Amino acid sequence: MTTLDDKLLGEKLQYYYSTSEDEDSDHEDKDRGRGAPASSSTPAEAELAGEGISVNTGPKGVINDWRRFKQLETEQREEQCREMERLIKKLSMSCRSHLDEEEEQQKQKDLQEKISGKMTLKECGMMDKNLDDEEFLQQYRKQRMDEMRQQLHKGPQFKQVLEIPSGEGFLDMIDKEQKSTLIMVHIYEDGVPGTEAMNGCMICLAAEYPTVKFCRVRSSVIGASSRFTRNALPALLIYKAGELIGNFVRVTDQLGEDFFAVDLEAFLQEFGLLPEKEVLVLTSVRNSATCHSEDSDLEID
């Protein structure tokens, strides 16, 4: 049974404040504060350490390990599939290029066989209707052009005007030349109207038609009469295979005293006395600039 003093002392004890108790409680709070981070960091460190190696051996750690394993397995399978696709694509491209090359070689072989063989008019008509033969027609035209080009350049090349020194040389030039060679001889004398123009034209045409043999000779060298010299010059004689196929006297009557290479060329082409020339190899007389002769001061436009 409590006395009045106990009650008074007890109430005092309940409301009594001790500094030592406060210090003890502060120490406990600090200890708990220091221990909290250590305990909170433990689960994070227990999840994964290194590359996919779980430190936590509990159920959650086993599940995470399994998920990581399946993820790596899926990535590896996808990489293998991509590598397989790249390999298949590479092999298909190489096979396709090889097949294309064989097909192109076979096509060229077939075209060559067609070109080498003889074509009838019926076959030519059928090829015009067939789109696949368009390439063959182009190839055929190209080969024909090459053949014509070779025929054009076959035989000797002259490219200049030759001076005949004597009457005997005049006869040898006609008789001893190849039968396929076309020979044009300008008979001239200095001071005759049209002679200088003819000399300049011959120089230009000799460069344009290298397979044609252009020559000139004085009328006095071949023993022509004075009457022929006065009335027939300038004269142009054309021979082939030893035969006279063209004889034009007093050319100034047709071309005038002042004419150009293009005029003489057109005049000879009108009579069919000039061969076909390759337009791509030599510049046309119509587009030539200026022709100079060592023996003449005449300028040809």
Swiss-Prot record:
Residues 158-301 are annotated as: Thioredoxin fold. It comes from Rattus norvegicus. CDD domains: Phd_like_Phd. The keyword Chaperone applies. One of its GO terms (biological process) is positive regulation of smoothened signaling pathway. This is Phosducin-like protein. The modification N-acetylthreonine is found at residue 2. InterPro entries: Phosducin, Phosducin-like_reg, Phosducin_N_dom_sf, Phosducin_thioredoxin-like_dom, Thioredoxin-like_sf. GO terms for molecular function: protein-containing complex binding. Residues 15-60 are annotated as: Disordered.
